[in-house]
Amino acid sequence: MALSSISIFIHCLVDPLPRKQTSKTLPSNHIDFKSAFNVANWSINQTLVSPLSAQCIHLTDEDVRIKERRTRAFKHILRKEGEGSHEVLAMIDAIQRLGIDHHFQDEIDEILQRQYTIPSYYNDNDLHGLALRFRLLRQGGYNVSAGVFDKFKDKEGNFDQKLSDDIRGLMELYEASQLSIGAEDHILDEAGDYSHQLLSSWMTRLDDSQARIIKNTLDHPHHKNLARFRATNFNRYFHMANIEGWMNELQELAKIDFQMVQSQNQQEIFQVAGWWKDLGISKELKFVRNQPLKWYIWSMATLSDPSLSQQRIDLTKPISFIYIIDDIFDVQGSLDELTLFTEIVKRWDVEAVEQLPGYMRACFKALDSVTNEIGYKVYKQHGWNPVHSLRETWASLCKAFLVEARWFASGHLPAAEEYLQNGIVSSGVHVVLVHIFYLLGHGVTREGVDFIGNRPAIITSTATILRLWDDLGISKDENQDGHDGSYVECYVKEHKGSLVEIATKKVTVMISDAWKQLNQECLHPNPFSPNFTKSCLNLARMVPLMYSYDDNHRLPVLEYYTKSLLFESVSI
């Protein structure tokens, strides 16, 4: 059973395989990027930053013209195919998987709107085509009924066994099942189980390359992964599939776009490195994690649109303070000191800061400076001063950290649900997303500010995903000396006789349910901008990469993607 060339391309984009590097002669004064940016510990060698900035990729005006010309050409192809059905959906899927949809968003929106409003499109009896249309529409925010898949069931209400040989259709059905929005989508849960079972069976009967395609689909469904991270191997697979026509056009555009975005990201890292050096926190607070590269990766993944360069730089700053304050609570502060620190942050009492020990004083002053800086930028650009709201998010975070510190100090292990509700706040997700809300500037009105301040479900579902993923990997984290506890630990203690394996399975189900809620919140209509909802999704997508530690307390997959995206070139 062979798979098509397009399937090889689309479904192999997720496989993080090492690429053979093209050898080139480097100047004698060349400095390797990886010598300055250490992904093993996520630190930056400040002495090499200035020399490296001169070696950053600098694209010519001709490069820009080529990209613009290719973009216009493919927009023409999209408009030409827009009246069709299957082919234009395959184009949109490829564009999104390559992470270049920001160039074609207007065209994609127009096509999806047409697909949504023409009922005849749902009469498609081709499983692959219907599942692809369903997934693209759901990803685009359209609340398409999962009942469109009822036609593929038999009289007993089970999926028809005639589908068992349709590998491409089953792969797309599995992809579509990731867009479930809850109990009303029970058919998608059935579809996910059904397609997973059959595809797993097919893996034992296909050759290695085709089995890998299926495995990649099952392990890394598109909706729950970061497109740009997974697209780093597209050169290899275009060559493997010998793809021609419009896919070739996309390949060339994607390679140029990759270089441009990589150059932009490198420049952003240099600015982050300069800010971190000038801040001086790592010298004053030697016990905190010194990982500015990792903190920037959070921003780069969450705010993926190239037009949001300054927002990525600004967002890295509060992300760094989440880690810094976490380390203060987790490994350094006494309970009395932490209580005082939390009270001062709650009041935002700049004068009372002198009561704090030196390391806390340095942290609060730096936090105050960054908060005011971001507040001024938002006010200047969007006409709203968010400082009060930003301070409230920091107070909530510190309060949640303090609750955990008191639990640990007293030896008290809370009930699992109590732990989770506090952990949703201590995850820091609310802090990150509130900053994103203001930095983007969309919907910054009194109603919008009040709504975001009350931690809507789009935030709590994202935070739940992070908190529970973090708990699953807690025994393999960065070997911090403190102790945070975990949902698994609380559940096992609360339910006498429960095994860790049972609790872990429950957590996996809870993560799946949180994803369903997040999917629901991203459907139209919702009160947030597309950039904000995409940021929530991207943050959730980034979580497995950030918390999948190996036995050496490292993040090998994240390290691989960081090198691929930031430091390795793609020849054009």
UniProtKB/Swiss-Prot annotation:
Keywords attached to this entry? Lyase, Magnesium, Metal-binding
Molecular-function GO terms, alphabetical: magnesium ion binding; terpene synthase activity
The Swiss-Prot or TrEMBL record lists the needed cofactor(s) as:
Mg(2+)
- Kindly give the SUPFAM superfamilies that the UniProt entry links to this protein: Terpenoid cyclases/Protein prenyltransferases, Terpenoid synthases
Quick one: which residues bind Mg(2+) 1? D326, D330
InterPro entries in the cross-refs: Isoprenoid_synthase_dom_sf, Terpene_cyclase-like_1_C, Terpene_cyclase_plant_C1, Terpene_synth_N, Terpene_synth_N_sf, Terpene_synthase-like, Terpene_synthase_metal-bd, Terpenoid_cyclase/PrenylTrfase
Q: What class of enzyme is it?
A: lyase
The entry's Mg(2+) 2-binding residues are D326, D330
Q: Which GO terms describe its biological process?
A: diterpenoid biosynthetic process; hydrocarbon biosynthetic process
One further remark on this entry is:
Does not produce any detectable product when tested in vitro.
The free-text function statement in the UniProt record for this protein reads: Probable sesquiterpene synthase.
Recorded protein name is Probable terpene synthase 13
The organism named in the record is Ricinus communis (Castor bean)
